[in-house]
From Swiss-Prot:
Heteromultimer with KCNB1, KCNC1 and KCNF1. Does not form homomultimers. Disulfide bonds: none annotated. One of its GO terms (biological process) is protein homooligomerization. Residues 185-269, 366-391, 449-461, 483-488 are extracellular. This is Potassium voltage-gated channel subfamily V member 2. It comes from Mus musculus (Mouse). GO terms for cellular component: voltage-gated potassium channel complex. A motif (Selectivity filter) lies at residues 474-479. Keywords: Cell membrane, Glycoprotein, Ion channel, Ion transport, Membrane, Potassium, Potassium channel, Potassium transport, Transmembrane, Transmembrane helix, Transport, Voltage-gated channel. Glycans are attached at residue 457. Residues 1-10 have a biased composition (Basic and acidic residues). It is found in: Cell membrane. GO terms for molecular function: voltage-gated potassium channel activity. The gene is Kcnv2.
Length: 562
């Protein structure tokens, strides 16, 4: 019983409420209530059961027996205040007329310029929906609060909603099944369902599965875009600096200097200096391990500072990194977010080993001076303590290699790689689990067939772990290999398992990395363009060029006059 019209209703005219003069709806008098719900039988299809809940006058109301009637089933109650306000606005134009609607068998609605005729008995099957409440309402005030507008002459209720989605709602009222189209936006569709009060549970299982998959995929994509946008932009909002009472504007300028390289020329120079000091520190760390450099440092030259030049370079780099970390710490408006940042943790790890090394060296020198004149029995204890301190110092020096991670603050690729690992932690975890299971299984199998071979290297399962790890990774150093036929069969299976295992997640990780990298690069480019717009580099260059041209023109004019 569908009736649609493509004519748009451009003007809304409010006319006195009168009984519609139609052939389908007889006039039964103004004081007579219209029966919205007729005697209803059992539902068919998805309308499983209807249980009578209460009776008011001559009208029988039915409540759906929902399984999950929680907050979602009571959401329509939150709109009562807005509906009452809308009803008061429309009722004020209908003062002096009867508040009791006439009895009707059909309901005429206009949604987005398209007209529909619906049976009231069909709408009454779903009294919790908006149209069901409209059909079962016994007062004009209640009906006017449920629609956007009403035309009394044609007895038509107007709704400013999407007609494409309402076509599915109309089919739901007539057939009892809510279908979902793939071209509809999941969020818009859910918003329309929430407005009309229709539950998603009325959709078929096939449509619901596809819809939930698209909704979850959309939510995941939006979440990833928000995280990537947050990484591309500054970590702190500018509104946090405005509410500060303690040097708010100064701290904001300092934060822009440290976190926004394209906000000013000084910020760009600061970013370049940070990367330069990181590279110098890494090169100095590598040169410090060269034997010739150590030999020259031990010989030294008499009468000067015994420290080699590489140690001075190290101290200079640590001083710069310390100053940078303190400036970031002093300018941040949110200490908790600053402490949770992985890049700030990398900055702390870059400078902490140097100060711990100085502290341990101070304790070692004091211990040596204290035990200089001690008896001989304390010499072994002192040597052991110094040896342990030396091992700790070597570990501390090795931790300086983590300074290379400071480049991630200004490297889009490194940040995209870290973001990929965080998003794919489940796939990476499964990969590590499969590798561990393969190492344990194949090492035990090879040990069981190779441990009796004379001169074998598979003396225990622990020794076979190295062979299994090298074989699964398809590296194959050749330092350990099975000699029996059964052992070689296990080796072949181990290598084949490693090839299959390593090939599965590579494509997934690469596709996600390339996707995240391109999106992060786009967000960074947008942020850079915005920051450069604030700095106005082109305006400055144009102004400088105009000044130079004006000066040259003035000089040429002066020469011509002379």
């Amino acid at each position: 019983m569908l009736k649609q019209s493509n004519e748009r209703r451009w003007s809304l005219s409010y006319k006195p409420w009168s009984t519609p003069e139609t052939e389908d709806v007889p006039n039964t008098g103004s004081n007579q209530h219209r029966r919205s719900i007729c005697s209803l039988g059992a539902r068919t299809g998805s309308q499983a059961s209807i249980a009578p809940q209460w009776t008011e006058g001559n009208y029988n109301y039915y409540i759906e027996e929902d399984e999950d009637c929680g907050e979602e089933g009571e959401d329509w109650k939150d709109d009562l205040a807005e509906e009452n306000q809308k009803a008061e606005c429309l009722t004020s134009l209908l003062d002096g007329h009867n508040d009791t609607p006439a009895q009707m068998s059909t309901l005429k609605v206009n949604v987005g310029g398209h007209s529909y005729l619906l049976e009231c008995c069909e709408l009454a099957n779903y009294p919790k929906t908006r149209l069901g409440r409209l059909a079962t309402s016994t007062t004009r005030r209640g009906q006017l609060g449920l629609c956007d507008d009403y035309e009394a002459q044609t007895d038509e209720y107007f709704f400013d909603r999407d007609p494409a989605v309402f076509q599915l709602i109309y089919n739901f009222y007539t057939s009892g099944v809510l279908l979902v189209r793939d071209e509809l936006c999941p969020r818009s569709f859910l918003e329309e369902l929430g407005y009309w009060g229709v539950r998603l549970k009325y959709t078929p299982r096939c449509c619901r599965i596809c819809f939930e998959e698209r909704r979850d995929e959309l939510s995941e994509q939006l979440k990833i875009q928000r995280e990537l946008r947050a990484q591309a932009q500054a970590e702190e909002a500018e509104e946090l600096f405005r509410d500060m009472r303690f040097y708010g504007p100064q701290r904001q300028r300092l934060w822009n200097l440290m976190e926004k390289p394209f906000s000013s020329v000084a910020a760009k120079a600061m970013g370049v200096a940070t990367n330069l000091f990181v590279l110098i520190s890494v090169v100095a760390l590598a040169l410090n391990t060269v034997e010739e450099m150590q030999h020259q440092a031990e010989q030294g030259t008499g009468g000067g500072d015994p420290r080699p030049i590489l140690e001075h370079v190290e101290m200079l780099c640590v001083a710069f990194f310390t100053l940078e970390f303190l400036l970031r710490l002093a300018s941040t408006p949110n200490l908790q977010r600053f402490a949770r940042s992985a890049l700030n943790l990398v900055d702390l790890v870059a400078i902490l080993p140097f100060y711990l090394q100085l502290l341990l060296e101070c304790f070692t020198s004091e211990d040596q001076r204290h035990n200089k004149d001690s008896p001989r029995e304390h010499d072994l204890e002192t040597v052991g303590r110094v040896g342990k301190v030396g091992q700790v110092l070597r570990i501390m020096r090795l931790m300086r290699i983590f300074r290379i991670l400071k480049l991630a603050r200004h490297s889009t690729g490194l940040r995209a790689f870290g973001f990929t690992l965080r998003q794919c932690y489940q796939q990476v975890g499964c990969l590590m689990l499969f590798i561990t299971m393969g190492i344990f299984s194949f090492s035990a199998a090879v040990y069981s067939v190779e441990h009796d071979v004379p001169g074998t290297n598979f003396t225990s399962i622990l020794h076979a772990w190295w062979w299994a790890a090298v074989s699964i990774s398809t590296v194959g150093y050749g330092d350990m290999y099975p000699e029996t036929h059964l052992g070689r069969l296990f080796a072949f299976l181990c290598i084949a398992f490693g090839i299959i295992l390593n090939g599965m997640p590579i494509s997934i990780l690469y596709n996600k990395f390339s996707d995240y990298y391109s999106k992060l690069k786009a967000y960074e480019y947008t942020a850079i363009r915005r920051e450069r717009g604030k700095v106005n580099f082109m305006q400055r260059a144009t102004k400088k060029m105009a000044e130079c041209l004006s000066e040259s023109h003035a000089q040429s004019t002066t020469r011509q006059e002379n």
